[in-house]
């Protein structure tokens, strides 16, 4: 996923074009569109994913876990839902697929703390860190 604003919005346009049934020439976008149709992905899952990727451009930190919830749904929980659908799992598994996606995102947050701070991003909510008597990491601002 592109980190730059222009690249991201160009990607979103190609995605929308592909979802309207038109080929884009972008193998990733066209293949996802085909997979999405074949596995009946819910459009709101992909919309949530794209919203979270946009938040990587527009939001630099989250005050509380509640503030982070929308980002987590789109950045990770829907990935679990996509995987459950690809694997043909029953919808009863969907809550667990969401939890697994969220857990993996927490691992990513921990792994990428240094890089995210260099990019001016902080995913661990400051208010919740204070509740745990942990100091918030500085983003240099």
Predicted regions and their residues:
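Acidic catalytic motifs of isoprenoid enzymes
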Residues: 1-141
């Amino acid at each position: 996923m592109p980190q730059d604003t222009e690249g991201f919005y160009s990607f979103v346009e190609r995605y929308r074009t592909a979802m309207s049934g038109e080929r884009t020439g972008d193998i990733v976008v066209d293949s996802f569109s085909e997979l999405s149709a074949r596995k009946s992905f819910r459009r709101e899952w992909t919309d949530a994913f794209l919203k979270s990727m946009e938040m990587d451009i527009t939001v630099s930190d989250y005050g509380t876990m509640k503030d982070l919830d929308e980002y987590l749904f789109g950045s990770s929980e829907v990935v679990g839902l996509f995987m459950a659908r690809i694997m043909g799992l029953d919808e009863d598994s969907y809550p667990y697929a969401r939890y697994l996606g969220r857990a993996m995102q927490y691992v990513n947050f921990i792994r990428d703390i240094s890089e995210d701070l260099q990019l001016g991003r902080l995913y661990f909510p400051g208010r919740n860190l204070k509740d745990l008597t942990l100091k918030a990491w500085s983003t240099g601002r």
